[in-house]
């Protein structure tokens, strides 16, 4: 620590979440001013020459590890502390600042903060600790009491005597660790408290310290700080009623400024330095603390993992064939090498812990993925049942997972069934102790679009202005305002219109300038998707805990206050329990298949033992691009790729999963051409053939780069992994060193420097985007399993797929289309046949799930099914309502089921069932009341399932088809009894030439491609004309509208922007049939296709305006034919479309054909109702409208 006489001991950072704009560097090196992306606490402290700092965020230690590491990097002493809100029934909540004297103090503070989050939730929000808790955990902590304390509150109320007694009480607790905080930031009440504090300090010998209660870095940040406070509190900056709690003086002042500010109280300055010298926390970073895994008494962790691994390998090899070219001895040698490495690095316990909870999960029937990440390259992991993919057949490398030349913690990422993942986490908590197991925190930040909207709101700007600016920010993941303004490293994401508006409009300048000051600040805390830590001791001995609260105000589901990187820094071992919905789909499908197999006495399907060379799966699913709903291969782009590549072996799937990413995607045409012999496969060196043969001479995987370094450059695989990492970082000095090593190794194999450099350059190029083969192989196995199920058991697979996304109507509709493409029958929901989920009732039939009806909850569905299974089918609406309790079955749910067609069996028709509903509900409510009061005379004591009352219920004619279809659309998200577009289909298709089904749209885009493995020539958009019924309209401000078109064969989302909206916006309304012209493109983000509208026409108006002639063939020999036809035509006159009638008449010489043209006053208006009436007349045998559409004029 330098000789400066002042140290800031009270600083809030962004991690206080509501009242600070001070950034904490994410990486230690960003503490240097020249390396900081934006000014942060440490970079500013370096500029000011501050010797030490204390971070004291409100009720948390979120920032501690990041702050600690960054401070040490630049030689600033880090002091750990926190502001605590303290609450007791007799007084309003008040504040106290605690600083850690040492590591023991840190543990006490950690305990105290954790207790606050677990037990101290306040009804009005936030948490507070009780004063007694502070007394229980005060040791090795220093306390700062200022004007926000209870003493400050009492003083403000004129009770100096009670205020002094308060300080005396805390002096008794903290002794010489108590300090009184003096501030001079221009806020109300400061000077009276300062004078009081100085007086008490003199009397009681309590030291005073100077503080600036820091909230922002520089004085000019005050507006941004106030904006942040307003965002958090939901207020506006110019709201005269909002509290003005802060002042523009609360910035990180220099020591000189503080010295001038407190020149009259030099002790207050000196005492900060003295206190800082007494704070000597030393965080124990970089050492791992594994939980204690129990082994038998006569075993050690190392002997036990060896024993378990060898036994596991033997069991595996009894069921699985050896890899081609490998012997049993090869397997044992590889196993021993891995075990030696694991034991030497001290990770036996880690492997055993992971194996234990995975094996437990499998014993419980919980679906678990075959592997994820580089862990799939470990033979020990396969032997211990951690993974389900033998690494040897696919040349997967253990060193990619655990490098003996680079000590780092192994990291198994485990995929679990989404439905049952929490069961495994609960098992781990029970086994190791709930106080030692926790999930991990994650922090949300103020992202570009969101912060613009937030700032616009607190500035009081019109919504239209703010919305229009936010929409100009590209939707690229992780984009910053700097990128959008063209100030990033590249201009790829620059928005020209945003830049233009920023330069031209003062309001936009103000909005974006303020938003950029707040962008990327931490704004909230949540739970990491899958991270779980297991500690050898209670977690609070390593870090504090954070928790949301339940309805009783107690903390629930605690998480660590350190994020996934920081928990590892303090030695906690992280395990990733990830949820993968595909595993749930596979599990549901296999259970349904085996249920059917059991009824038919057929052996069950074992999804883990599938042959990976099933020809129908490759031919009918992968090579044909029939991969909708197939894991990783669903997108339209991937389906096109599959049709080109025509994979016919598992290795191809691994490669395609790895290649279908930005960067390596450019290699796909070459890969495809080489696979099919259109191009020659060339290897950089003959020795690399075995490494590259599965990918036809192309480097696709990181493992291939490592093996090239080993075979050509003489590296060990451990060293090769270090080379791969170095190539990814592209540090010139490090690369030059490795190039020389590679040359020397290659020379030993007889290769000259020129050729060695050529291969090194090739490796360096591919290392930049090479994929992890272990991960690709494990996930390709899951893909293959879904494809195999789709090919051999399509009904069960599609039923499971539909069930997995029942709450997502758009996905349900898409999957139903795919089911029909597979020639599966989908039966409407039916209370006498449907379960909660979709079910395969036969090999070619799926029964709609009741749970997919909007407005019908799971508990209702389960009650319906349970009652039906116990007491038989429902026979009437009354029977149904009396058997399913009203508490679960309300009127809204009943109406939804009627509209969905689920109650069709219970009455004459839907209209009748709906008509009967009020009387049935009234009767069942009466029955319920009388049963509750014990009056059984009316209803008797009938057994469940038997009618208990008879009503004379009315019936009526069925609703019109349009009403039925609308009801289905509202409750199911789709039309079941037909489609409103059906009457128009023939005429519209003659106009536009195609439907909206996926294959038709693929053909349109596919016409832009050259085949035979040549490089694609895809255009960003393909101009086309489509038509459909508008089923939804979604507006984004005044400049963008999204409409979804359907035609009963498919659907597409169309977008219209300001240029099109000005001319055609009035046409974009629901239930209108539109013909649209625009740019068709593949929607890689959401899957499927989208179209940007440039022109559109109302179909009905187009018929009227552009029909050139109506052609009719009429048989006048039928009775009164002409009278009927003429009467129909008369109702559509006057009009602009002439007619040509091909007439068939009787004459004395037999049938005679003739033609009659009608025009002028005999012309008609072309409307769909006219065409419908004419088509229904028995005398009309042919009808056609000739158009001259506007797009061909």
Swiss-Prot record:
GO terms for cellular component: cytoplasm. Its EC number is 2.7.7.7. It comes from the Bacteria. It catalyses: DNA(n) + a 2'-deoxyribonucleoside 5'-triphosphate = DNA(n+1) + diphosphate. Keywords: Cytoplasm, DNA replication, DNA-directed DNA polymerase, Nucleotidyltransferase, Transferase. It is found in: Cytoplasm. GO terms for biological process: DNA replication. SUPFAM superfamilies: Nucleic acid-binding proteins, PHP domain-like. CDD domains: DnaE_OBF, PHP_PolIIIA_DnaE1. InterPro entries: DNA_pol3_alpha_NTPase_dom, DNA_pol3_alpha_thumb_dom, DNA_pol3_finger, DnaE2/DnaE/PolC, DNAPol_HHH, NA-bd_OB-fold, NA-bd_OB_tRNA, PHP_dom. SMART domains: POLIIIAc. It is an enzyme of class 2 (transferase). One of its GO terms (molecular function) is 3'-5' exonuclease activity. Disulfide bonds: none annotated. DNA polymerase III is a complex, multichain enzyme responsible for most of the replicative synthesis in bacteria. This DNA polymerase also exhibits 3' to 5' exonuclease activity. The alpha chain is the DNA polymerase. Belongs to the DNA polymerase type-C family. DnaE subfamily. DNA polymerase III contains a core (composed of alpha, epsilon and theta chains) that associates with a tau subunit. This core dimerizes to form the PolIII' complex. PolIII' associates with the gamma complex (composed of gamma, delta, delta', psi and chi chains) and with the beta chain to form the complete DNA polymerase III complex. This is DNA polymerase III subunit alpha. The gene is dnaE.
């Amino acid at each position: 620590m330098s000789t400066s006489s002042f140290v800031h001991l009270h600083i809030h950072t962004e991690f206080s979440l509501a009242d600070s704009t001070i950034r904490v560097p994410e990486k230690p090196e960003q503490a240097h001013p020249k390396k900081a992306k934006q000014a942060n606490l440490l970079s500013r402290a370096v500029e000011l020459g501050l010797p030490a700092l204390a971070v004291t965020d409100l009720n948390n230690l979120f920032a501690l590890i990041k702050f600690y590491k960054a401070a040490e990097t630049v030689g600033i002493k880090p002091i750990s502390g926190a502001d605590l809100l303290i609450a007791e029934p007799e007084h309003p909540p008040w504040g106290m600042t605690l600083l850690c004297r040492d590591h023991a103090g840190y543990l006490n503070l950690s305990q105290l903060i954790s207790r606050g989050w677990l037990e101290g939730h306040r009804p009005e929000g936030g948490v507070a600790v009780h004063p007694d808790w502070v007394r229980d955990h005060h040791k090795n902590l220093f306390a700062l009491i200022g004007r926000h304390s209870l003493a400050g509150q009492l003083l403000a109320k004129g009770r100096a005597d009670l205020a002094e007694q308060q300080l005396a009480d805390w002096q008794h607790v903290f002794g010489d660790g108590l300090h009184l905080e003096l501030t001079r930031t221009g806020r109300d009440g400061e000077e009276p408290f300062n004078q009081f504090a100085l007086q008490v300090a003199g009397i009681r010998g309590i030291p005073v310290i100077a503080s600036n209660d820091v909230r922002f870095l520089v004085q000019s940040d005050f507006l941004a700080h106030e904006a942040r406070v307003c965002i958090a509190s939901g207020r506006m900056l110019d709201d005269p009623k909002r509290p003005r709690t802060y002042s523009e003086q609360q910035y990180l002042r220099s020591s000189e400024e503080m010295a001038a500010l407190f020149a009259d109280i030099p002790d207050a300055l000196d005492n900060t330095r003295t206190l800082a010298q007494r704070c000597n926390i030393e965080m124990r970073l970089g050492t791992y603390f594994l939980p204690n895994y129990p082994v038998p008494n006569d075993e050690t962790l190392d002997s036990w993992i060896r024993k378990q691994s060898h036994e596991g390998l033997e069991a595996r090899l009894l069921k699985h064939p050896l890899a081609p070219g490998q012997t049993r001895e090869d397997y044992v040698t590889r196993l021993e090498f891995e075990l030696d490495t694991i034991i030497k690095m001290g990770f036996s316990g880690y492997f055993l812990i992971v194996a234990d909870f995975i094996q437990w999960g499998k014993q419980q029937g919980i679906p678990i993925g075959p592997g994820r990440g580089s862990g799939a390259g470990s033979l020990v992991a396969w032997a211990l049942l951690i993974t389900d993919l033998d690494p040897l057949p696919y040349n997967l490398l253990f060193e990619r997972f655990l490098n003996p030349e680079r000590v780092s913690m192994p990291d198994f990422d485990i995929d679990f069934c989404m439905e049952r993942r929490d069961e495994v986490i609960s098992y781990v908590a029970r086994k190791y102790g709930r106080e030692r197991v926790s999930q991990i925190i994650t922090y949300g930040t103020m992202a570009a679009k969101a912060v613009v909207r937030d700032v616009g709101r607190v500035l009081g700007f019109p919504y239209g202005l703010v919305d229009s600016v936010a929409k100009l920010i590209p939707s690229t993941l992780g984009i910053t305002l700097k990128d959008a303004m063209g100030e990033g490293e590249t201009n790829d994401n620059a928005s020209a219109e945003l830049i233009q508006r920023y330069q031209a409009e003062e309001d936009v300048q103000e909005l974006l300038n303020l938003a950029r000051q707040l962008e990327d600040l931490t704004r909230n805390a949540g739970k990491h998707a899958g991270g779980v830590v297991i500690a050898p001791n209670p977690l609070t001995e390593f870090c504090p805990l954070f928790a949301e609260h339940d309805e009783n105000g107690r903390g629930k589901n605690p998480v660590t206050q350190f994020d996934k990187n920081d928990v590892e820094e303090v030695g906690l071992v992280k395990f990733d329990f990830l949820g993968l919905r595909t595993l749930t789909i596979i599990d549901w499908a296999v259970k349904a298949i085996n249920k059917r197999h059991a009824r038919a006495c057929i052996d069950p399907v074992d999804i883990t033992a599938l042959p990976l060379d099933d020809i129908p799966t490759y031919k009918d699913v992968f090579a044909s691009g029939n991969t909708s709903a197939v894991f990783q291969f669903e997108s339209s782009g991937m389906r096109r790729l599959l049709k080109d590549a025509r994979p016919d072996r598992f290795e191809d799937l691994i490669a395609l999963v790895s290649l279908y990413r930005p960067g390596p995607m450019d290699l796909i045409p070459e890969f495809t051409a080489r696979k099919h012999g259109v191009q020659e496969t060339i290897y950089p060196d003959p020795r690399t053939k075995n490494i590259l043969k599965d990918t036809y001479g192309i480097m696709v995987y990181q493992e291939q780069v490592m093996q090239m370094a080993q075979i050509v450059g003489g590296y060990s695989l451990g060293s090769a992994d270090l080379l791969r990492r170095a190539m990814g970082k592209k540090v010139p000095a490090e690369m030059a060193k490795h190039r020389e090593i590679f040359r020397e190794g290659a020379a030993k194999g007889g290769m000259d420097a020129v050729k060695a450099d050529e291969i090194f350059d090739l490796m360096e190029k591919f290392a930049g985007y090479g994929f992890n083969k272990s991960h690709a192989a494990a996930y390709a196995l899951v893909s293959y399993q879904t494809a195999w199920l789709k090919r051999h058991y399509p009904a069960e697979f599609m039923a499971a797929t539909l069930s997995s996304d029942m709450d997502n109507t758009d996905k349900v509709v898409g999957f139903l289309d795919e089911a029909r493409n597979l020639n599966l029958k989908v039966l409407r929901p039916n209370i006498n046949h449907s379960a909660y989920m979709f079910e395969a009732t036969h090999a070619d039939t799926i029964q709609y799930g009741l749970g997919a009806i909007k407005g019908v909850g799971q508990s209702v569905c389960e009650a319906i099914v349970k009652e039906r299974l116990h007491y038989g089918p429902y026979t009437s609406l009354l029977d149904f309502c009396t058997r399913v309790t009203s508490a679960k079955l309300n009127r809204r749910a009943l109406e939804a089921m009627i509209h969905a067609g689920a109650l069709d069996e219970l009455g004459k028709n839907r209209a009748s069932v709906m008509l009967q509903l009020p009387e049935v509900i009234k009767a069942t409510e009466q029955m319920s009341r009388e049963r509750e009061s014990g009056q059984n005379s009316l209803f008797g004591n009938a057994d469940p399932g038997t009618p208990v009352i008879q009503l004379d219920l009315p019936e009526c004619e069925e609703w019109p088809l349009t009403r039925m279809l609308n009801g289905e659309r509202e409750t199911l998200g789709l039309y079941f009894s037909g489609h409103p577009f059906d009457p128009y289909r023939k005429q519209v298709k003659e106009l536009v030439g195609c439907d909206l089904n996926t294959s038709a749209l693929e053909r349109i885009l596919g016409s832009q491609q050259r085949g035979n493995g040549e490089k694609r020539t895809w255009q960003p958009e393909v101009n086309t004309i489509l038509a459909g019924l508008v089923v939804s309209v979604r507006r984004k401000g005044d400049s963008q509208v999204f409409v979804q078109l359907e035609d009963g064969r498919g659907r597409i989302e169309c977008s219209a922007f300001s240029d099109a909206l000005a001319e055609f916006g009035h046409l974009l309304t629901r239930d209108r049939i539109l013909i649209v012209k625009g740019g068709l493109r593949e929607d890689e983000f959401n899957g499927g296709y989208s179209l940007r509208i440039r022109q559109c026409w109302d179909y009905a108006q187009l018929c009227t305006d552009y029909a050139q002639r109506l052609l009719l063939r009429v048989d006048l020999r039928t009775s009164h034919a002409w009278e009927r036809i003429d009467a129909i035509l008369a109702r559509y006159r006057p009009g602009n479309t002439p007619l040509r009638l091909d007439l068939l008449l009787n004459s004395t010489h037999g049938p005679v054909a003739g033609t009659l043209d009608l025009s002028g006053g005999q012309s008609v208006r072309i409307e769909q109702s006219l065409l419908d009436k004419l088509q229904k007349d028995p005398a009309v045998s042919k009808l056609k409208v000739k158009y001259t559409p506007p797009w061909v004029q």
